[in-house]
Amino acid sequence: MAAKDVVFGDSARAKMVEGVNILANAVKVTLGPKGRNVVLERSFGGPTVTKDGVSVAKEIELKDKLQNMGAQMVKEVASKTSDNAGDGTTTATVLAQSIVREGMKYVASGMNPMDLKRGIDKAVFAAIEELRKISKPCTTNKEIAQVGAISANSDSSIGDRIAEAMDKVGKEGVITVEDGKSLQDELDVVEGMQFDRGYLSPYFINNPDKQVAVLENPFVLLHDKKVSNIRDLLPILEQVAKAGRPLLIIAEDVEGEALATLVVNNIRGILKTVAVKAPGFGDRRKAMLEDIAILTGGQVIAEETGLTLEKATLAELGQAKRIEVAKENTTIIDGAGEAANIEARVKQVRTQIEEATSDYDREKLQERVAKLAGGVAVIKVGAATEVEMKEKKARVEDALHATRAAVEEGIVAGGGVALIRARTAIAGLKGANADQDAGIKIVLRAMEEPLRQIVTNGGEEASVVVAAVAAGTGNYGYNAATGEYVDLVDAGVVDPTKVTRTALQNAASVAGLLLTTDAAVCELPKEDAPMAGGMPGGMGGMGMDM
């Protein structure tokens, strides 16, 4: 085991804070409508240009072990916020940096870090309750478009595309983002279905960039039992191989010898297959397999219907134009099922919804209707160059997450103003002692920081703008894109409540951990072994007396 270095107290914290600052300073320049770009080096190909906070954070690894620990903890803030809310990564990083910076001053002056953390947690809880109160539901297409535009760095065309896609497939529908072929963004709505089961082995992946398995014009085999013996599958595999098309196997499970054989065939390019588990459990699994069968124009191979795997033919298999299998979900696009059969199935499920007695059953049945009838919307991102395409695609994906979050929990005024307004709930808050009061003050100061950074990135004086916004009420705030003080919700500058809430929660959580850290353990760099001794130089012993 390698030797470890243990650093205590202020020495450990100071180094970790340096790491926090390096990462946060690189990320925060991207905040707001006038945020700057960050260029990321790639080991091959040209550099990537981005204004996405989490993309910048993920690239940062520092040489100093302690600094790197601090940076990685704040990277966690950005990643968690991105995973939970899809946006707000830069805001979360700015909040975390501010809480750490202010908190360290109090720790250095001798205050109790645990009480500071309790004060911080108390203030954050009050602020989140206030955010929920001032939140308003996001229902209209216009509001959805505004959220999408803000999240895509004030690009209204992206917001409009997302609103249009949600309008076409419904709020619950599946929306995916792909590379376009032209300079313009395009929207395609394709009949399709997505369920929450992914590939059973990563060896099925054939698109390493997106970490997905893509099958073009495949057959779909549906089976309600486990498949472990390859002999059961051989007859149908031979028929599919002759047809020269890929195959998706959806069964209760595919394991052992059967899975190994499919993987080997896939790697050798003999037969392109992907195996996934059937979605749902029990009776619901049977119903969902039946849904997929109707959508793809196939049949479920089950003993109840008198069909067995050994005797299955291509006629019993479903078909689709394209299927994408990711780690955790499978999307079937343009199934070959008859429209009339799909319509009849939807009608049948809607009848079951009306008769359902439990909320859970009703919710699951509604999900099935959305999957059968909703389809999949594909936003094709257009750009002039590949670098621009990648950057724009990342923004569209961010905006898509943000709009989903807005539909889920509502919207608040954007531009850092919601956090300024939520401070009113903290202003009168009192802790159990002076140290907890200091923790509350830390959060009060931190909640100004996103607005300050947005204004600074826009080239204006932050203190003046913060004072002017704090003096106002409601949605009155500073629109950094135009440099005017307006009602931000009317101007379309809005943030999803979930994004603002998640950013504050995650920032406080990780910053609290950093403040209460009193020792850090890291590996010492390995010392290079000394070089083996060699023969002395020159021609020893060959001297000549003159």
Curated annotation (Swiss-Prot):
Reaction equation(s) it catalyzes: ATP + H2O + a folded polypeptide = ADP + phosphate + an unfolded polypeptide
InterPro entries: Chaperonin_Cpn60_CS (IPR018370), Cpn60/GroEL (IPR001844), Cpn60/GroEL/TCP-1 (IPR002423), GroEL-like_apical_dom_sf (IPR027409), GROEL-like_equatorial_sf (IPR027413), TCP-1-like_intermed_sf (IPR027410)
UniProt enzyme class: isomerase
A Pfam cross-reference name: Cpn60_TCP1
Entry keywords, A to Z: ATP-binding, Chaperone, Cytoplasm, Isomerase, Nucleotide-binding
Location in or out of the cell: Cytoplasm
Gene Ontology biological process: protein refolding
Role, per record: Together with its co-chaperonin GroES, plays an essential role in assisting protein folding. The GroEL-GroES system forms a nano-cage that allows encapsulation of the non-native substrate proteins and provides a physical environment optimized to promote and accelerate protein folding.
Descriptive protein name: Chaperonin GroEL 1
